[in-house]
C-alpha cells in the first residue's frame, strides 16, 4: 500500500499497450480480448505467465497489440480484482 487511503501504485500501459477484458478462453494459451480501443483481439498468454498467473473470463489485463498483425496481442499483465476496481474508480477503465 502506498498510503493510508488504500491506493496502490499500479502498472499503467506504455505507449504500445492497452487495457483489455478477457471475453473467453480459446484453448491452450489463447484468449479473446475486448480492448479499450474498441477492437476485439486474439490474445496470447506468454510462457512466463502460462502456469504462474491464472487468467479467467472477465479479468482485466494489459495487452500489447502486435505491430505486424493488429488483430492479435500479447497479454503482458493481469490485474487482481482489487486493482481492477481501483482502475475503475480512477476512471482509467469502464
Curated annotation (Swiss-Prot):
Residues spanning the membrane: none
InterPro entries found in the cross-reference section: NA-bd_OB-fold (IPR012340), RNA-binding_domain_S1_IF1 (IPR006196), TIF_eIF-1A (IPR001253), TIF_eIF-1A_CS (IPR018104)
GO biological process: translational initiation
SUPFAM superfamilies: Nucleic acid-binding proteins
Domain S1-like: 6-80
GO MF term set: RNA binding; translation initiation factor activity
Pfam families xref list: eIF-1a
GO cellular component, one term: cytoplasm
Alphabetical UniProt keywords: Initiation factor, Protein biosynthesis
Annotated SMART domains: eIF1a
Family: Belongs to the eIF-1A family.
Function: Seems to be required for maximal rate of protein biosynthesis. Enhances ribosome dissociation into subunits and stabilizes the binding of the initiator Met-tRNA(I) to 40 S ribosomal subunits.
HAMAP family recorded: aIF_1A (MF_00216)
Protein name per its UniProtKB record: Translation initiation factor 1A 2
Amino acid at each position: 500500500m502506498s498510503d493510508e487511503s488504500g491506493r496502490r501504485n499500479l502498472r499503467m500501459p506504455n505507449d504500445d499497450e492497452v487495457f483489455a477484458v478477457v471475453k473467453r478462453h480459446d484453448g491452450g494459451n489463447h484468449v479473446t480480448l475486448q480492448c479499450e480501443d474498441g477492437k476485439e483481439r486474439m490474445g496470447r498468454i506468454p510462457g512466463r505467465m502460462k502456469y504462474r498467473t491464472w487468467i479467467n473470463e472477465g479479468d482485466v489485463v494489459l495487452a500489447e497489440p502486435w505491430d505486424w498483425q493488429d488483430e492479435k496481442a500479447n497479454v503482458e499483465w493481469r490485474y487482481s480484482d482489487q486493482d481492477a476496481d481501483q482502475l475503475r474508480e480512477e476512471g482509467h477503465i469502464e
